Amino acid sequence: IIWLMVLVMLGTLAQKDMGLFAAQNKYFSSWIIWFYFLPMPGGRLTLIIISINLCFFFFNKNIWKIKKLGIIILHFGGVLLLFGGGLTSMFSSEGNMVIEEGAQSNHVEDYHLMELAVINTSAAGFDEFTIFDQPLLKRNQLLRHANLNFEIEILNYLENCEPARRTSPAGIQYKGMLKNFMLNELIPEKEDNWNRPGLIYQINNTGTRADGMYGIFLGQSVSQTVSINDKDFTIILRRKRTYLPFSIELLDFKKILHPGTDIPKSFSSEINLIENGAVRKVLIQMNEPLRHKGYTFFQSSFIEGPNSETTVLAVVKNYGRLFPYISSIIMCIGLLFHLSQKLPDLFRKSKEKIAV
């Protein structure tokens, strides 16, 4: 418990210098923390040790008595709380959904993770997507797939970058955007989602003029396209997408301003929840989220455009969402039960003292 308090203090102080996401990964989501050359247990390992310690409590023969039932219930609630926290830490995900008025969306974009999408746009009726997740986007990694008749070699992954126009002609090996621009690496921002990642890669073994070195970055206004053996491909670096079994259509976005200011007081999104052909109208407001199929949609922010407004919904999937509520109720029951067993003895001792 004392070491957990130290971790909370260190992680809280570190947020000022390294940002929330990096501090969380270093102190709370890690198994081991290195203090210079000394390894120490991280947040996950510490909580596992505490959980094991709590579980061993139930193997004590002396506790299985009626008069200690409240303590047993209390410890069971604590184990349940830690189990729910483990589920949240290991399997929960969060991102956002950006929808313009009148448009629909069926995917969530991750705040931190990226993916490389290679889209075959040759067919008239559909596009074929081949996705490579961020763990594969590292230096000297060779990307192959049965859907692709070429190879992509990752030359460099830039955590944060900006494009800059070339001051001298590029060599013949540079293709696409890199013929006119370079990607300059920048110092990463404290907050991870403020970064603009970039990728420098090489296309190999096409047997065509498409072989060469390319560059792309997050939010690139003109997508990188390439034609290889009569097939057209679009290559995009984007935030990792999670596709949902339903769609959300934004009907109307409303915001209320503080009187006499341009500062929003509250805002809401009137949406259609579309699933298997069925349409249900829902209003998402601040502090009144939509919960559906394990996902929770919060009204996060908005984007004002010249002709329409765009809503930004924060989306969370938390498998351990109910555990804090359930475990808190169980622990309260355990405490009340324990107090109800102890109060008669306390009253009796008080009466004996008064009598004396």
Feature-to-residue mapping (PLM):
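Membrane-embedded alpha-helical segments of integral membrane proteins
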Residues: I1-I63
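Active-site-proximal structural scaffolding
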Residues: I2, I48, L69-I72, F76, ...
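A broadly tuned "polar low-complexity/structure-edge" signature
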Residues: W3-G11, I50-F57, K61, K67, ...
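Long, intrinsically disordered, low-complexity accessory segments associated with secretion
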Residues: W3-L4, Q24-F28, R44, L87, ...
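Short hydrophobic alpha-helical segments that form membrane-spanning helices or hydrophobic packing faces
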Residues: L4-M5, G84, Q299-F302, G334
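Internal alpha-helical transmembrane segments
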Residues: M40-A124, V312, V316-K349
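Soluble non-transmembrane domains of integral membrane proteins
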Residues: F91, G95-N318
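Cytoplasmic C-terminal tails of single-pass
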Residues: R348-V356
